[in-house]
Amino acid sequence: MRYISTRRGPNTPTRSFSDILLEGLAPDGGLYLPEEYPTLSRSDLDELRIVLREDGYAAMAAGIISLFVDDIPAGDLSAITARAYRTPAFSDPQIVPVDALEGTGLHLAHLSNGPTAAFKDMAMQLLGELFEYELTRRGDWLTIVGATSGDTGSSAEYALRGRRGLSVVMLTPAGRMTAFQRAQMFSLLDENIVNVAVDGVFDDCQDLVKAVNMDADFKATWHVGAVNSINWARLLAQVCYYVATWLRVTEEGADASSKVSVVVPSGNFGNVCAAHIARQMGVPLGTLVVATNENDVLDEFFRTGVYRPRSSADTLATSSPSMDISKASNFERFIFDLMGRDGDATRALFETALARDGYFDLSGTPEFAALRDTYGFTSGTSSHADRLAEIARTEKESGYLLDPHTADGVHVARAVRPQIEGPLVVMETALPVKFADTILEATGHLPPVPERFEGIEGREERVTPLANSVEDLKALIRERVRPGA
């Protein structure tokens, strides 16, 4: 299995999984994808169903990941997934349980049973194990430079804290996260963790990360890698839970006609991109529903064919803050597939059109028609009032308390439910404890606090303020990172 860049030219070399694991962004500014997606036949899915039932989620994940990874021995890969997906790190032995959301006609895939109560743990726990394995094998070290709108940062830091050969520099948008999210990150005092509050929004943080990655000399000197969803291994981990979701919703003997549709609360497009990849592999996923908040750039694209990222000033601060994103970094991976895996066409859209015009327009093209007909996408959006009403309604009808982002998903799911046949699964994003103020506003009471999080907001915190400057960020990395530590 070899990997290519979404902006590849005819002479661009392919890379191995272990190389791109540590590299993150491709040198040409593109994102890595497999040369071709492996396929899962009905018999493959039947076998994975047996493995999931008898051996558990970690063994099933190893079977899927092995299709994409041929430079890590199978036994080592199985051990890696077993360490990543274990109890008590995950509070439910199923890792990803799926159940019916009573009274709604919907299912809910529970992705928030990990250490930080967010779906990002599903990828980060695996990434931490893969990084440590590969760095030990090479006798190397890595500086992770990442950006977070709320959940990626804490998930990455909990997965990587104290690991040999790894330093983490995590950028956050100052004042844009909840008190719980800030406490989860800033209370980590490990020497290999550097928390940074940037004067800007998440997209500014993400741009700084990309700028550091585009400086080839600095990247090589400081061994810069990525945990954001620009890292292919993140998406690979997420593909696994879409397979598990389909297996858990369908019956024994289900075939390609047993479609399961999913609703994915979306900001950076990584989560739903993993659903797209699972669908391309042959997992019988029906409609892929992109659910956005008021920062509805993705909804605009799927409705009109126009992709128009907003400026930092025009990115709204909402009550589902982890989706306050207007430049969806993983979107390029899907567009590459949509454009027939044409690197030149993808580069023309993301380098030329966006830089020149601030948008690109696929309306009226065969590609726009293919969004729904070939790739199964549709979308919807949710407002502050919508998510508050949904949190209150679902608690009253189902006895289940949603976090604001999952509430966006359930709101959109109710809207599209009449047009979709078969099971419709909302992919949960986090536990409500992370968003206490919004839960209080919606329901009149605070969310329950799991025992492992009691007192977290009163702990000592450490964070470094930073101007929105790539040179200032590089200076901070030089000052705070210990090479080889």
Question: Positions of the model-derived regions?
Answer:
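PLP-dependent amino-acid enzyme catalytic core
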Residues: 1-485
